A protein has these predicted regions:
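Short, well-structured N-terminal submotif of metal-dependent ribonuclease cores
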Residues: 1-44, 57-71, 138
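Active-site neighborhoods of divalent-metal-dependent phosphate/nucleic-acid chemistry enzymes
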Residues: 2, 79-121
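Acidic active-site catalytic centers that drive phospho-/nucleotidyl reactions
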Residues: 10, 51, 107, 126
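A generic structural signal for short hydrophobic patches within well-formed alpha-helices
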Residues: 14, 49, 129-130
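Structured helix-beta-strand junction loops
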Residues: 38-39, 75, 132
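Amphipathic alpha-helical segments within well-ordered protein domains
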Residues: 50-53, 92
Length: 138
């Protein structure tokens, strides 16, 4: 991966970064530190933010969820993509693919947003990203 490459950060990565007890925490932390050191252009989406906040609120505490939300604002250069109705409509095409069974609607919208922005890399621990043609970092 080149320096200053665009990278999409998925829910699983945010969760692993936020929760030190998460089995993927160390792997996520190492990937995150490498991305920051290489000046990666980081993106995520409103659906991913909402999904992550909800998970942290339910499986950790409200304070953890709020602290994570506040930490996003401190990340210089993080782009949070909105998800239009047109993008959601386009996302449904991924559900027709037989190789993407048990796909989440949030992941499908992520694929559309990544494709539209030309993002090839994802900090994600979900096999669907690779199946859909994106490259994992971390």
């Amino acid at each position: 991966m080149k320096s200053r490459e665009a990278v999409f950060v998925d829910t699983g990565a945010w969760i692993a970064l936020a929760l030190t007890r998460d089995p993927l925490h160390q792997r996520a932390r190492e990937a995150w530190d490498s991305l920051l050191a290489n000046g990666a252009r980081l993106s995520t989406s409103v659906p991913v933010v909402l999904e992550t906040f909800t998970f942290l609120d339910r499986h950790a505490t409200r304070d953890v969820a709020l602290a994570w939300k506040d930490s996003l604002g401190a990340l210089k250069g993080l782009r949070v993509e909105t998800c239009s109705l047109a993008a959601m409509q386009e996302a449904w095409q991924y559900f027709a693919r037989r190789d993407l069974h048990k796909l989440s609607a949030v992941d499908a919208t992520s694929f559309v947003l990544m494709t539209r922005r030309g993002i090839r890399y994802a900090l994600a621990f979900d096999h669907h990203f690779a199946t859909a043609g994106f490259r994992h970092v971390g």
